């Protein structure tokens, strides 16, 4: 199958045909991770509700949790105002980060909240 042409026409891709995907935890709103998608990954994600991404390093599609069991069930997909980023609202099973942490954004605080 191919991505719905109406959706595809709204996407702005980089030179490699990719766009940013942000995975946000359903319920908490916490950002879990950022990855890349292409049209095929978005189509697969929308058809299966299993988050599918594009690996730039491996040059292939991957389904989150396919090997680790740490899956992302996708509840909704939203396109940002510029058309270059999608927001996936997901139910995360296990850690989202490859380091074993719940989110990829808990390593270094560059600017702490004001007290």
Swiss-Prot record:
Q: Name one GO biological process term.
A: L-histidine biosynthetic process
Enzyme Commission number(s) from the entry:
3.5.4.19
- Please verify whether the record's keywords include Zinc: yes
Q: Which cofactor is essential here?
A: Mg(2+); Zn(2+)
Q: What class of enzyme is it?
A: hydrolase
- Co-factor binding details: Binds 1 Mg(2+) ion per subunit.
Q: Where in the cell is it found?
A: Cytoplasm
Q: Which reaction does it catalyse?
A: 1-(5-phospho-beta-D-ribosyl)-5'-AMP + H2O = 1-(5-phospho-beta-D-ribosyl)-5-[(5-phospho-beta-D-ribosylamino)methylideneamino]imidazole-4-carboxamide
Q: In which pathway does it act?
A: Amino-acid biosynthesis; L-histidine biosynthesis; L-histidine from 5-phospho-alpha-D-ribose 1-diphosphate: step 3/9
Sorted keywords for this record are: Amino-acid biosynthesis, Cytoplasm, Histidine biosynthesis, Hydrolase, Magnesium, Metal-binding, Zinc
Quote the record's binding site residues for Zn(2+).
Answer: 81, 97, 104
Task: Give the function comment from the record.
Answer: Catalyzes the hydrolysis of the adenine ring of phosphoribosyl-AMP.
Spell out the protein name for this chain.
Answer: Phosphoribosyl-AMP cyclohydrolase
Q: Which organism is it from?
A: Mycobacterium sp. (strain KMS)
